[in-house]
């Protein structure tokens, strides 16, 4: 039987991943890319009240390349997502003054966690995910907000929003508070209107400006699929954010059309692994009515949880969503089996960072090196930091032995609880 041919629209990060997964499954992929290079192309709009009158320079964050063009300028950056804050911080080293305009404020997390490990390496774990699912939303929000405010008071810095920390997509930046306290970045409310040479903000203040950078996000559309896929308010009804529910045959999948609370690349790969097996007929989708019901349920849960905005229409929780995809492919880690046969690996899978190696331990695409990669990932993270030969001081432990015993027992109990509650 001849191998099936697959058209991949777009040679962005997810498109390249789709190419690789198609080849892994013995399919014949052809990738179509409109631009002259790989890497992706997002759609965006630049607008604002009175912008047509503004005599200065304005652009979208996608077109921003370097702060040198803004040397000595007074610049407004509109939007406090990750792109907006990163650009504002970088511009503040070259521009005369940077104004950061925010509609509702934001909570700012930092890249480096306690002890110097990357934030996601410390907090994106199955154990932390279990705690978040067991504890009340208000409790987890309180503790995380308190931790962030211990670093810098968001209200004092004019950044604190009305919503809670877990009601938004995370904004991450280490340098913003330093740039605000030095006066190089000034936080302002939403822009009411532009004049020829200035921006008037909703609090009535006016600032003379030379340039505007709109970091207001992107929109998506599928003009080549207008007959069967309609985007309404930046939303599209897809089963598991991938499959249209009303096609006669499952021959169409959307890859990477999500905004995860974690890295997007591992999710795109798992989506591709599932989609290719569906295309080959190795996996079936549920009936259309079941898919529509789940789509509606997911949309309702998202509306209850997140701030209403274009930014929060395709949110997914990193580990739960990855596990959903992995279950479909047949590669979700069997925690109980791991705990019984390889407790050392099981503890790292549960309490360590949830890296993509976990989905190469079993099933289709199993990799013999996955176990070793998981057990050595901490060493690989810290190795680049050890650039000065030095022996660690040999301090005697201040923790009594009995406490260590109880802590070890607690770890085992927590693991068993996770295993029993994990779907």
Question: Which residue stretches match the model-derived regions?
Answer:
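Short, well-structured alpha-helical segments that form the helix of a local strand-helix-strand
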Residues: 291-299
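Flavin (primarily FAD) cofactor-binding/catalytic cores of flavoenzymes
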Residues: 2-118, 123-291, 303-423
């Amino acid at each position: 039987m001849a191998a099936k041919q697959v058209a991949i629209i777009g040679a962005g990060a997810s498109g390249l991943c789709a190419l690789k997964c198609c080849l892994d499954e013995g399919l014949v992929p052809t990738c179509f890319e409109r631009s002259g290079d790989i890497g992706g192309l997002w759609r965006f709009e630049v607008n604002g009240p009175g912008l047509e009158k503004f005599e200065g320079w304005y652009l979208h964050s996608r077109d921003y390349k370097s702060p040198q063009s803004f040397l000595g300028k007074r610049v407004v950056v509109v939007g406090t997502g990750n792109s907006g804050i990163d650009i504002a911080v970088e511009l503040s080293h070259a521009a005369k003054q940077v104004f950061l305009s925010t509609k509702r404020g934001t909570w700012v997390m930092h890249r480096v966690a306690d002890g110097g490990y990357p934030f996601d390496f410390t907090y994106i774990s199955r154990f932390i995910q279990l705690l978040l699912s067991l504890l009340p939303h208000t409790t987890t929000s309180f503790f995380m907000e308190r931790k962030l405010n211990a670093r810098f008071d968001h209200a004092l810095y004019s950044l604190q929003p009305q919503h809670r920390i877990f009601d938004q997509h995370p904004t991450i930046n280490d340098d913003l508070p330093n740039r605000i306290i030095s006066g190089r970045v000034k936080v302002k409310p939403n822009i009411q209107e532009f004049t020829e040479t200035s921006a008037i903000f909703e609090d009535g203040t006016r600032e003379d400006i030379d340039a505007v950078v709109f970091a207001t996000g992107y929109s998506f559309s599928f003009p080549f699929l207008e007959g069967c896929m309609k985007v309404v308010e930046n939303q599209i009804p897809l089963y598991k954010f991938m499959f249209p529910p009303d096609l006669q045959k499952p021959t169409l999948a959307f890859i990477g059309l999500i905004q995860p609370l974690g890295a997007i690349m591992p999710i795109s790969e798992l989506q591709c692994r599932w989609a290719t097996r569906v295309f080959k007929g190795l996996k079936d989708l549920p009936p259309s009515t079941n898919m529509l019901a789940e789509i509606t349920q997911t949309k309702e849960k998202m509306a209850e949880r997140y701030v209403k905005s274009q930014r929060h229409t395709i949110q997914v929780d990193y580990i739960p969503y990855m596990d959903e995809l992995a279950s479909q492919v047949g590669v979700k880690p069997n925690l109980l089996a791991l705990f019984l046969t390889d407790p050392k690996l099981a503890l790292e899978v549960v309490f360590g960072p949830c890296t993509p190696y976990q989905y190469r331990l079993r099933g289709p695409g199993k990799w013999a090196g996955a176990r070793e990669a998981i057990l050595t990932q901490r060493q690989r993270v810290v190795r680049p930091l050890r650039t000065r030969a030095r022996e660690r001081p040999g301090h005697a432990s201040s923790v009594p032995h009995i406490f260590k015993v109880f802590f070890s027992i607690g770890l085992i109990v927590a693991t068993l609880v996770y295993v029993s509650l994990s779907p």
